[in-house]
Regions:
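Conserved nucleotide-sugar phosphate-binding/catalytic loop shared by glycosyltransferases and other
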Residues: 1-14
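Donor nucleotide-activated moiety binding/catalytic core segment of transferases
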Residues: 15-25, 149-193
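Conserved nucleotide-sugar donor-interacting segment of glycosyltransferase catalytic cores
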Residues: 21-75
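Structural motif
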Residues: 29-30, 86, 118, 178
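A donor-sugar binding/catalytic signature common to diverse glycosyltransferases
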Residues: 30-38, 42, 52, 171-204
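Nucleotide-sugar donor-binding patch of glycosyltransferase catalytic domains
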Residues: 54, 67-70, 161-164, 197-204
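A nucleotide-sugar donor-handling region in carbohydrate enzymes
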Residues: 61-128, 145-149, 167-168
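Catalytic donor nucleotide-activated moiety binding site of glycosyltransferases and closely related
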Residues: 123, 130-163
C-alpha cells in the first residue's frame, strides 16, 4: 500500500525547499511542468504563471473517473504536489474540455504490430523470481519478463527474463499477445493503441 506521508518524508524536505527558492525563474514568462514539484512550487510562491501538462493534471477535473470510495489523502496529494494556475490533462478519454487523449510516440503510431505466442511482463516493483514463480504455473503460456536490475538475460521455466532496453522492449511489445504491467498511463495507453490484451496491477 502506498504511504503518501512516508513517500513525502523519504525525500529530503530541506533540500526540496532550498531547490524551490534557489531555482531562477525570473526571466521566464510562463513555467510549464509535467507534474514536477520544484518548478511548480517555485512559480506559485514567486507569482509566476504556470501550466501543467500531464496525466495527473487530468485528475484536477471532477469529470475524471474516480473510485466509488474517494481517497481524500490521495486527492489532497494530487492537488498540492505540483500546483499550477492552468492545466492540460491527458487521459484515456476526453473527459473534460481541457483533457485530451494520450500522447503517443511516433514509432507507436507508425508501427505495424504482429501477434506472436507470448506475453510481455513489466512489473518493475516486483522481484523477478517472485513473478516467474507465479507465471510458471501457467505452463501453456510463454512470458518475456523485462527488468533493468538483472545483469544477463536468463530463462526460468516458461519465462524469459530480459534486461530492459528500449528497442528490445518495444519490439517485444509490438509483437506480443498482451502485456502485464502496473496500472499507470503511458504504457497502458500504448498497449491499447496497439490493440493488445492488457492486464494491469493497481498500486494501492
Amino acid at each position: 500500500k502506498v504511504s503518501y506521508l512516508k513517500s513525502f518524508f523519504a525525500n529530503n524536505l530541506l533540500r526540496f525547499i532550498m531547490d524551490v527558492f534557489r531555482i531562477n525563474i525570473k526571466k521566464y514568462d510562463l513555467i510549464i511542468s509535467d507534474f514536477e514539484p520544484i518548478s511548480a512550487w517555485s512559480s506559485k510562491l514567486k507569482g509566476k504563471p504556470s501550466l501543467q501538462l500531464s496525466h495527473q493534471a487530468s485528475l484536477f477535473s471532477k469529470q475524471s473517473p474516480r473510485p466509488i470510495e474517494i481517497d481524500r489523502l490521495a486527492e489532497f496529494f494530487i492537488k498540492w504536489y505540483s500546483p499550477c494556475d492552468r492545466y492540460i490533462g491527458f487521459h484515456f478519454k476526453d473527459y473534460d474540455k481541457n483533457i485530451y487523449g494520450p500522447l503517443l510516440r511516433d514509432k507507436i503510431v507508425r508501427a505495424k504490430p504482429r501477434t506472436e505466442d507470448y506475453y510481455v511482463v513489466y512489473l518493475w516493483n516486483y522481484n523477478v523470481d517472485y513473478i516467474a514463480n507465479i507465471l510458471s504455473c501457467f505452463k501453456n503460456y510463454q512470458f518475456k519478463i523485462f527488468d533493468s536490475r538483472i545483469e544477463n538475460n536468463l530463462q526460468i521455466d516458461n519465462c524469459e527474463v530480459i534486461k530492459t532496453g528500449d528497442d528490445s522492449f518495444f519490439n517485444a511489445m509490438l509483437n506480443c499477445k498482451g502485456v502485464i504491467c502496473g496500472a499507470g498511463f503511458e504504457l497502458p495507453a500504448e498497449v491499447l493503441y496497439l490493440q493488445k490484451r492488457l492486464y494491469v496491477i493497481p498500486i494501492g
